[in-house]
Amino acid sequence: MAAVLVLSSAGVALTQATTSFADTGVNVWLTTADQADKLTPQSPIAFGVGGSGDVITVNPDATYQSIVGFGGSLTDASAYNIWNSPSRDAIMDNLFGSGPDGISLSFLRQPVGTSDFSRSFYSLDDVGPGSSDPALSQFSIAKDQAYIIPLLQQARSLNPQLTFMGTPWSAPAWMKTNASMLGTKDAALQPGDEAVYAQYLTKFAQAYQAQGIPISYLSVANEPAWPPLTYPGMLMTPQQQSTVINDLAPDLAAAGQNTKLLAWDDNWDDITGVYPDQSYPKQVLAATGANTAGVAWHGYDTHDPNAQTAVHDAYPGTDVLETEHSWTSGTDWPGEITGQGSDTAIDALRNWSRTVSFWNIALDANGGPKTDGGPTIDNGCGCTAPVTTDGANVTYNAEYYVLGHFSKFVKPGALRIDSNVVGSVNNVAFENPDHSIALIADNTGSSAQTFQVSYKGSSFGYTLPAGAMATFTWPGGATRFGTITGHQGLCLDVQGANPADTTPVQVYTCNGTTAQTWTVEPSDNTVHALGKCLDVQGGATANGTPVQLYTCNGTGAQTWVPQGDGSLYNPQSGRCLDDTGGGASTTRTQIFDCWHNDNQRWNLP
């Protein structure tokens, strides 16, 4: 390791380490088509050991989208299965926990009311036949509180970085043209009910927020181009979707909800001139402007995610989220690893998606339950899930391990970085907020593939079996030194340049002193100044807890994980470093809910 002399932005001379990646260890996890390995750690390898074959070059200087998360949906069916399993806590730990067996799922797309995987059909505002409730006086989430919401709360306690999205399959029957939750008779939202439907969705976001489940993303209709005959759904034209979004955005803002709206939430179909093609989301984006944050996509039908890139290129400031795809056989490990791992997950991520979301999280041995005494559902999905429950038995299917190759190693806020595809080895790479690198590779071919991975001039070799998937991780960052600037260009500052324990940390006019010279250490996610650590006072976790300088002690109060949006996240509290009050000099910093606003954006050295 060599040392070089650099200047901080304040002109202070600093000694900065530069890293050579020769001999750097690479950790490997492997899943094989024959099930001999299931996300199994392999013997570490190292850069500099050489290799042969085509070269995958991982380039951290070419960056793309930041990651929101990986997961699926705790549908009514999924929640019912997990809730009633004697292994409930173990299942939840394995899905959302960060322990050795947990895969740290970080994204959940939740139905607003019923979906096609529900034990009964219901909305959040049901009234009797022939009645209506435009005042929404009968709105209630009581059915969700039986087992869905408790599991969502448990999931968030296991992974505080979990992001929630909401999606309605149907408006309440009294708002629809066929007066039914089903999609029969080309069911649609009644013209003129767009405003009350927007209020209905706003009340959903408020009610879930009150339960400690913030809805970060919301679409207004699941698969709006498809009117299902035997389960809830409804058609919605681009024009009507635009009207709903333009009503909903100000309603959410007035209700204090920091919720982003997504257009479409339907398939990757990309047949020019054949409805629905890319014109649907483009029409909505054009008609709604800043009210729509992005586009949600499903991986069915054409199974070609290039439509994501086409719409992203036309509207480059918008988010792309892949929000649903399911497989039909949990026992087809070769097909599942390729279909869900390469064709869905990797390809979606290489086409700008910030999420990978499969469908149901857990189903029973019959692929359900779907209804309880209601009409027979024919949803065309002989679906499996990451988890199968069968009485006291629990099976973790191929989808579980495929998701784990991403969610366990690619953290929210990670940036996708450039990597090239070689032969049958499809792949995607990321730089995490702690600057570690994760490369996920999937050999879609029928024979083993030998290749090299090159990073910053060093390389290693690997042979990936046919139909197998591997995740490679290695430390990618180096210690950084300099100023940390925040809102209105003010610097993070140790008050009075006092190195004593409990000295407040504030924002202050940048002056180039040592009180504003910080060390950002990616190896342990600490931030130092004057020989001590940035610290949450008393190790507390509540909103508004002050931030101070304190002797470094290795506790969670001193862990700060940089996020892709510029925030500094404290995992122990589940909150972010916040410039209290919005940017006046001498304002003390605190921790607060991560709203990702200007008060929480920091420019690191």
Give residue ranges: language-model regions.
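Substrate-binding and catalytic surfaces of secreted/luminal carbohydrate-active proteins
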Residues: 23-60, 164-166, 199-217, 227-480
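Lectin-like carbohydrate-binding module/patch detector with strong preference for beta-trefoil
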Residues: 478-605
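Residue-level detector of short, conserved catalytic/binding motifs and their immediate flanks
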Residues: 54, 68-70, 103-110, 162, ...
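Secretory targeting and sorting signals
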Residues: 1-22
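Conserved residues at the C-terminal ends of beta-strands
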Residues: 73, 111, 221, 298, ...
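N-terminal catalytic cores of secreted or lumenal carbohydrate-active enzymes
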Residues: 35-215, 236, 246
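Soluble non-cytosolic domains of exported or imported proteins
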Residues: 85-86, 142-146, 191-199, 235, ...
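Short acidic/His/Gly/Ser-rich catalytic and metal-binding motifs that mark active-site loops
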Residues: 117-121, 172-179, 224-229, 271-274, ...
